[in-house]
């Protein structure tokens, strides 16, 4: 009798752990799809945030001109944009993002995706000129759009769980 109870609890525990693992994997690997459909503040960019934050989980297609860097920071390089070098978009583990436009400017964003600073690589100083943030965000989308377009719809849609987990992050 005692063996049956212990075995039942053990099997139940294993089933719960496996179910949580499947949900976690689904949320991570389909985070870009879920971010496209999640409610968020106007200035937030959940798609841009998730495409690099979960770069090692999402589908990274082999597209000519696009390179991925998983060592250290998570970067997406697009050689089609930028005059001197490839434009890149990166995620730092302290919840910051950076965009290198390939034209001597490095834009830094905080965890709410607000512009923190603009670094001029040519003069090695921060620029104080006003920046059109919406134009910078359009440029970032242009750089990572092929990766975003390659993401498929999840087999099991857990949008409601994704929205519940990230409600404070994007609002």
What do the predicted segments below correspond to?
Residues 1-18:
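N-terminal Sec-pathway targeting helices
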Residues 7-8, 29-37, 166-169:
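N-terminal first transmembrane alpha-helix
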């Amino acid at each position: 009798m005692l063996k049956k109870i212990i075995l039942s609890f053990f099997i139940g525990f294993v089933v719960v752990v496996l179910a949580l693992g499947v949900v976690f994997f689904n949320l991570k690997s389909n985070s870009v799809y879920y971010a496209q459909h999640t409610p968020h503040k106007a200035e937030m960019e959940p798609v841009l945030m998730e495409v690099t934050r979960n770069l090692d989980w999402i589908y990274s297609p082999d597209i000519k001109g696009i390179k991925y860097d998983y060592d250290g920071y998570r970067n997406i390089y697009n050689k089609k944009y930028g005059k001197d070098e490839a434009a890149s978009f990166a995620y730092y583990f302290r919840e910051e993002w950076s965009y290198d436009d390939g034209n001597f400017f490095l834009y830094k964003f905080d965890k709410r995706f607000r512009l923190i600073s603009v670094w001029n690589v040519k003069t090695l100083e921060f620029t104080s000129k006003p920046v059109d943030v919406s134009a910078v965000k359009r440029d970032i989308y242009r750089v990572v759009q092929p990766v975003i377009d390659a993401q498929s719809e999840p087999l099991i849609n857990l949008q409601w769980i994704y929205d519940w987990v990230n409600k404070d992050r994007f609002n």
